[in-house]
């Protein structure tokens, strides 16, 4: 039932407050609501925030100038855990009085006509003084005396109650009437790495180099540890391994996904399980569990986290297929059903049937996950979570977080929006997205605005490629396209990722029209000579390193919620800015989407979006090239694909008094959703 005052559209809230919104430690979190009442009396509101441990505190909410029913506040959570907040709204008699006497004074009313207003003002300030501390109490009582002094000019008696000092005191110790409390909403706050992270994917088995005859040698955890030095130097935070478990022998796939393997074929890591073990074992050729623990330790020394693949499926010779046939679907002929996506068949993989023995499956998967957590793994990339029950994932993530809230789960869910965002709502920290297929200016703009608007729900990890996805733009766009896509991914989201080989411009598909790599690393060893490519100038590694450095140096690129697109008079150029409300750091990015031709145009800078005023001039510094320019509202840019595909301009810091408003949640006109 509605209260005395209306409190509507409280944000953030997810699925009717049945699930918590998302945030991380140190993130600027906007809170907003519609607060209203009848008549002309002013209303005010606070956000009442309760940390996981500690006392509740209040934040005064600001009203929009031209839409005063919209109220806003921001806060920065400083600890992990479940935060709660509610909106308290009330009738604000002091603001009502200030508005009334200001209008009457401007209308030229006399002291006699304002007598009742002065009397009411004295009463209000005396009431306010009673609840203020001593120093502020004296200020408020002094104002009451001035208002009551009929020997003073009218404007002096009115204006004494309108100063900024008075407003600050009354914001801190407001007079509140008809207090109405809104619903309690929840925000799940994770560690910062759930939002700010650069991922690099590599296959440990491909790190062994070649033998004397030029044949690939199976990598080990030891050779993988050596490869981590290069990954760390590029500035990545997380190194992700596809499954490191034993690979099935039965129905093993051959090179390029051929149905029959020949002697020496290593198979797909996603066909998990053999006589050597299942999801809790390591592939014998990679090493031992102790070797893996040493690898995790080495990664941490380099400032890297290791992410493991959690692929809940089994090869026909997985121990589960032998000991837990109830985990699968058994056909009429007594065989276990293999995976199918008609007309495709995957004879090397058995999908799990979660409804046959849910308790057994749930407990076994939890045991497997905690096995790796206890070995030092704090991040999991989950393979195809949208093909498993959503209540299972909610149960598993909640259960793991009971003891290990630091564990991050990335959903590899290339699926319909309801599934993708539904999985995010129930607990996945990050999600793959359709960024790979967003190539035009219009599509990129719509995509970026969508994901920033859904920051309470989902955190997009923008991978430029994966072992499964070599987009046509990379196949045909030349080397410049690799730089273009990297620049977009690294600056549009605080989460981005690269699959090994991207820096070598690997671009050949298995056949025309396919997004699969030729000689896919999913089915064979693919050692790479990164150093020779770097020495010969045939590597994107320096540019990727520079992008990660720029990201680390600029907090504006470490947040998801604030992105603003600027008009630029060329469909092949895209321009957008980001601002960090804590530091005031501001960045403006311009990218040439044409990988074969130079593009130029005039950019019309929306000055308010970067904390400036129209007509201002300001200095911009290109973090990529080092060049500096003096800019204004309208500026010329030109980008050449073989020289610089993007400008990443560092702008003047936004002054403190303009920062918070830039972090407010955008509420479109007439958006009155429940």
What feature does the model see in each segment?
Residues 1-205, 209, 213-237, 299, ...:
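Carbohydrate-interacting/catalytic domains
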Residues 193-219, 247-295, 322-359, 518-527:
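Aromatic- and acidic-residue-enriched carbohydrate-binding clefts of CAZyme catalytic domains
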Residues 198-200, 239-241, 306-308, 380, ...:
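Hydrophobic faces of well-ordered beta-strands that scaffold small-molecule active sites
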Residues 219-230, 357-372, 481-486:
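Short, acidic/polar
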Residues 232-256, 310-329:
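Carboxylate/His-rich catalytic cores and anion/metal-binding grooves
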Residues 315-326, 393, 402, 414-442, ...:
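Substrate-binding cleft/loops of secretory-pathway carbohydrate-active enzymes
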Residues 322, 326, 330, 353-423:
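Active-site neighborhood of glycoside hydrolase catalytic domains
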Residues 397-412, 417, 439-514, 582:
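Catalytic-core region of carbohydrate-active enzymes that cleave or remodel glycosidic bonds
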């Amino acid at each position: 039932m509605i209260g005395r005052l209306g409190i509507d559209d409280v944000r953030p809230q997810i699925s009717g407050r049945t699930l918590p919104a998302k945030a991380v430690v140190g993130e600027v979190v906007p809170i907003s609501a519609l607060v209203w009442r009848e008549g002309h009396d002013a209303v005010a509101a606070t956000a009442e925030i309760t940390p996981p441990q500690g006392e509740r505190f209040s934040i005064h909410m600001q009203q929009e100038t031209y839409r005063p029913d919209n109220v806003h506040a921001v806060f920065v959570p400083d600890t992990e855990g479940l935060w709660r907040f509610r909106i308290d709204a009330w009738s604000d008699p002091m603001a009502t009085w200030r508005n009334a006497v200001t209008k009457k004074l401007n209308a030229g009313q006399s002291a006699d006509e304002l007598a009742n207003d002065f009397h009411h003002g004295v009463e209000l300030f005396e009431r306010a003084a009673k609840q203020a501390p001593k120093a502020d109490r004296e200020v408020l009582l002094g104002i009451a005396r001035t208002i009551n002094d009929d020997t003073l000019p009218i404007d002096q008696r009115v204006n004494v109650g309108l100063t900024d000092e008075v407003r600050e005191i009354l914001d801190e110790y407001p007079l509140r009437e008809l207090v109405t409390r809104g619903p309690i909403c929840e925000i799940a706050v994770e560690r910062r790495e759930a939002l700010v992270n650069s991922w690099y994917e590599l296959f440990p088995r491909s790190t062994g180099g070649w033998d004397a005859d030029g044949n690939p040698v199976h990598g080990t955890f030891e050779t993988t540890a050596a490869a981590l030095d290069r990954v760390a130097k590029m500035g990545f935070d997380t190194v992700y391994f596809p499954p490191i478990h034993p690979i099935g022998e039965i129905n093993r796939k051959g090179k390029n996904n051929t149905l029959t393997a020949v002697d020496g074929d290593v198979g797909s890591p996603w066909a998990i399980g053999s006589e050597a073990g299942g999801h809790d074992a390591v592939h014998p050729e990679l090493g031992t569990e102790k070797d893996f623990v040493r690898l995790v330790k080495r990664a941490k020394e380099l400032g890297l986290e290791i992410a493991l693949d959690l692929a809940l499926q089994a090869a026909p010779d997985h121990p589960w297929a032998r000991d837990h046939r109830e985990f699968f679907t058994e056909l009429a002929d007594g065989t276990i059903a293999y995976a199918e996506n008609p007309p495709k068949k995957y004879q090397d993989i058995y999908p799990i049937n979660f409804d046959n023995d849910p308790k057994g499956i749930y407990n076994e998967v939890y045991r497997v996950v905690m096995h790796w957590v206890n070995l030092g793994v704090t991040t999991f990339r989950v393979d195809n979570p949208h093909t498993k029950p959503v209540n299972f994932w909610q149960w598993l993530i909640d259960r793991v977080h009971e003891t290990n809230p630091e564990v991050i789960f990335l959903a590899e869910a290339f699926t319909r929006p309801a599934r993708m965002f539904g999985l995010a709502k129930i607990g996945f920290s990050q999600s793959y997205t359709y960024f790979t297929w967003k190539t035009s200016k219009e599509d990129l703009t719509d995509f970026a605005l969508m994901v920033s608007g859904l920051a309470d729900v989902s955190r997009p990890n923008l991978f430029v490629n994966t072992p499964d996805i070599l987009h046509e733009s990379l196949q045909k766009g030349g080397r410049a396209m690799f730089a273009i896509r990297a620049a977009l991914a690294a600056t549009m989201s605080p989460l981005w990722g690269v699959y090994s080989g991207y820096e070598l411009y690997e671009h050949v598909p298995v056949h025309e029209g396919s997004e699969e790599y030729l000689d896919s690393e999913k089915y064979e060893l693919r050692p790479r000579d990164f150093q020779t490519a770097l020495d010969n100038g045939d590597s994107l590694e320096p540019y990727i390193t520079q992008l990660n450095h720029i990201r680390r140096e600029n907090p504006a690129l470490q947040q998801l919620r604030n992105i603003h697109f600027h008009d630029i008079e060329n469909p092949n150029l895209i321009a957008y800015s980001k601002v960090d409300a804590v530091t005031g750091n501001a960045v403006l990015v311009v990218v040439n989407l044409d990988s074969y031709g130079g593009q130029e145009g005039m950019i019309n800078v929306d000055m308010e979006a970067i904390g400036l005023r129209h007509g201002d001039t300001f200095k911009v510094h290109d973090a990529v090239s080092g060049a500096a320019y003096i800019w204004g509202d309208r500026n010329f840019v030109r980008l050449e694909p073989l020289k610089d595909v993007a400008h990443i301009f560092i702008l003047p810091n936004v002054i403190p008094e303009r920062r918070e408003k830039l972090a407010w949640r955008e509420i479109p006109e007439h958006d009155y959703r429940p």
